[in-house]
Amino acid sequence: MGKAQSVRFKVSKLMAYILRHDPWSFNLQPDEEGFVDLEEFVNAIRRVYPWVTKEFILDIVERDEKERYEVKEGKIRARYGHSYPVILDHKEDKESKTLYHGTIRENLEGIMREGIKPMKRQFVHLSLNYEDAYNTGRRHGSNVVVLMIDADCLRKKGFKILKAGKKVRIVKYVPVDCIVGEL
């Protein structure tokens, strides 16, 4: 990772932290959908990175492969990953058949007993492919296991699968019997 990429990565991490977990520490007041004023958000980021511009933030939003952020009507929010309650208006995924969840092996026993819970978040994050799920699991440790999730099973049990990004799906909970394999 080059220096420019490293700086972009660090700013993006701060953006995600603020928008997903603690806007109040930066004097931001999210609305019920998690949006904050974009200009105020840029000023909040400048408290840590004084050189940041609105254009730099918008470029991060535009280039983000996981589509973590959304800008609308002069406001910005995280599209998923919140640890505080937000109302999300994402479209429902009615097409996916198999989804994937990356975790570490140490979590497997509890998951196979209780299902996949959102833990400190509002939703469980699922991926459309093995590689993305594996990379998500790697953030938590090196002994990664990827679980295969039957999306139709989730739907039959009344769980809505939401499209949080092109390759990211979110759901309130994954029951044990909807986990159909381990890779």
Curated annotation (Swiss-Prot):
Its EC number is 2.7.1.-. It holds the Pfam family PTS_2-RNA. Removes the 2'-phosphate from RNA via an intermediate in which the phosphate is ADP-ribosylated by NAD followed by a presumed transesterification to release the RNA and generate ADP-ribose 1''-2''-cyclic phosphate (APPR>P). May function as an ADP-ribosylase. Keywords: NAD, Transferase. This is Probable RNA 2'-phosphotransferase. SUPFAM superfamilies: ADP-ribosylation (SSF56399). InterPro entries: Ptrans_KptA/Tpt1, RNA_2'-PTrans_C, RNA_2'-PTrans_KptA, RNA_2'-PTrans_N. Belongs to the KptA/TPT1 family. It comes from Pyrococcus abyssi (strain GE5 / Orsay). The lineage of its organism: Archaea, Methanobacteriati, Methanobacteriota, Thermococci, Thermococcales. GO terms for molecular function: NAD+ poly-ADP-ribosyltransferase activity; tRNA 2'-phosphotransferase activity. One of its GO terms (biological process) is tRNA splicing, via endonucleolytic cleavage and ligation. The keyword ATP-binding does not apply.
